[in-house]
Regions:
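Solvent-exposed interaction patches of small proteins and small membrane subunits
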Residues: 1-136
Length: 136
């Protein structure tokens, strides 16, 4: 059915965009905080895994292992959409991703906000260390 195909394509592209947006955020964190992006054929997977790691004296983990594991399903699906696209879109797989998305988003949002709080505290300490304050 053309309507079902168009719907699946639309949902697939939205799931693709969801993960791509997160990956851009992870890239920004790694570039600005960690210092260097992973490279090689597995860099997308390595980047996601790096988000689960505490980097001593630099930053806490951005994501829990459980969140990263769930996001890895979206990463793998994004790869499928990019490289095989509609030839292999399985409605059940899309439905599975859609069913976990609300709870994943709730958890992911909390973890990202916690990391944002860390960055804000770090910025405050850095400003104070440089003799800057909100009143300067």
């Amino acid at each position: 059915m053309p309507e079902e195909s168009a719907y699946l394509d639309s949902v697939a592209l939205n799931l693709h965009g969801f993960y791509t947006g997160l990956e851009r955020l992870f890239e920004l964190i790694v570039r600005r905080v960690d210092g260097a992006l992973p490279d090689g054929e597995t860099w997308h997977r390595d980047l996601l895994q790096r988000m689960t790691q505490d980097i001593v004296e630099i930053r806490p983990a951005v994501l829990s292992q459980d969140t990263a594991l769930a996001l890895d399903e979206f990463r793998r699906f994004r790869h499928l959409v990019r490289n095989v696209y509609s030839l292999s879109l399985v409605p059940e797989r899309i439905a599975g991703l859609m069913s976990i998305l609300p709870q994943l988003w709730f958890t992911l949002r909390a973890e990202l906000l916690a990391f944002s709080d860390f960055l804000e505290a770090l910025a405050q300490v850095t400003q104070e260390g440089n003799g800057l304050s909100d009143e300067s």
